[in-house]
Amino acid sequence: MKKRTIAELLTDIRMAKYKIDMWISKAENRNKALERLSLSNIGRFPLLSKEYIKETELTRKYIVTLVQLKILLEILEIRLETLIILGNVVTYLSPLVEALNELKGQLGASIEFSPIIDEIIETIRTVYIAPNTVQQSPQINVKEEARQLLKEAEDVAKKELKENYKIEI
């Protein structure tokens, strides 16, 4: 794997956020279409209408996960920009990598997102975390901070979904 710079990684993160925005927009449009179909078919085809409602719920969950992923990428972007100034890589990025892995697992095997997120995670691990593990100073609980980051991303995602996408969770 080619060693990449933080600037290149930041560019990848920004592109991933843009793609996530596109997918959220597509999912929103699909959600609106399914809601219209559900309402128009409720009298004639109640079973079909129920299936549309179920798919609407699945699409909403997908949007929630995408917004959380976008927020985690924004946090990663901020941390990488801060890292340029600060310098201690392992302590700063390990919890975010763990949180991205967990959220990627929730998202499933997406053809569109998995390769992008895998590449970002792999770059962070091989280029920034692995070479610096020997000089890791303070011991931190990576899993706990990852859970905290996921909780923070979930809270921000709920707020953003309510304000921008009119989705209540």
UniProtKB/Swiss-Prot annotation:
Keywords: Cell cycle, Cell division. It comes from Sulfolobus acidocaldarius (strain ATCC 33909 / DSM 639 / JCM 8929 / NBRC 15157 / NCIMB 11770). The keyword Cell division applies. It comes from the Archaea. InterPro entries: Cdv_Coordination_Protein (IPR053658). Part of a cell division machinery. May fulfill a coordination function between the Cdv proteins during cell division. The keyword rRNA-binding does not apply. Signal peptide: none annotated. GO terms for biological process: cell division. The lineage of its organism: Archaea, Thermoproteota, Thermoprotei, Sulfolobales, Sulfolobaceae. This is Cell division protein B3. Disruption phenotype: Deletion mutant forms extremely small colonies on selective plates. Forms enlarged cells, with a highly elevated content of DNA. Mutant shows aberrant cellular localization of CdvA. The gene is cdvB3.
